[in-house]
């Protein structure tokens, strides 16, 4: 069975009950393009001591826990977008920002086709929920709530942990 089918079937049933501005019909004859999004796996430190990574509890559908992020605005660089989104969503200033991977599977978000540029960064303060986040919190990597993650964020975090453990040598996913 298609990997995306099972995971997003439940999302589909939730989505059909939610009114979404993004679900409006495109202009006839307009070219359809994926939506560009960005996320950051934020490593939180207390001085030099690693505390865990930041996750959010989404405040609107699709609900669940997620890596913080959002859409890149027209005229904005991906790097500026991820910094803006982290200020708006979790009230953090990023340090040592590095591009990690690009995720572009068309079914990664059941609402629309999106291309996500994922980064890794450091922060030296605790997150605070804002914007779309109902909650923002730090989770130890051993306590990641795998079954509660939205979108393809379990895959992204598995890739991150592989990279951190040395099982993947490239920051950019092949």
Task: Describe the role of every protein-language-model region.
Residues 49-89:
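Conserved Nudix-box catalytic region and its N-terminal flanking loop in Nudix hydrolases
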Residues 156-174:
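Charged phosphate-binding loop/patch that engages nucleotide di/tri-phosphates or the phosphate backbone
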Residues 120, 128-162:
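NUDIX/MutT-family hydrolases
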Residues 92-102:
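A short coil-to-beta-strand element that immediately follows conserved catalytic motifs
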Residues 9-18:
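Bacterial N-terminal signal peptides
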Residues 35, 104-127, 160:
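Active-site-adjacent beta-strand/loop module that shapes the phosphate/pyrophosphate-binding cleft
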Residues 25-53, 68-71, 120:
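Conserved N-terminal beta-strand and adjoining loop/helix that marks the start
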Residues 1-9:
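Bacterial N-terminal signal peptides that target proteins for export
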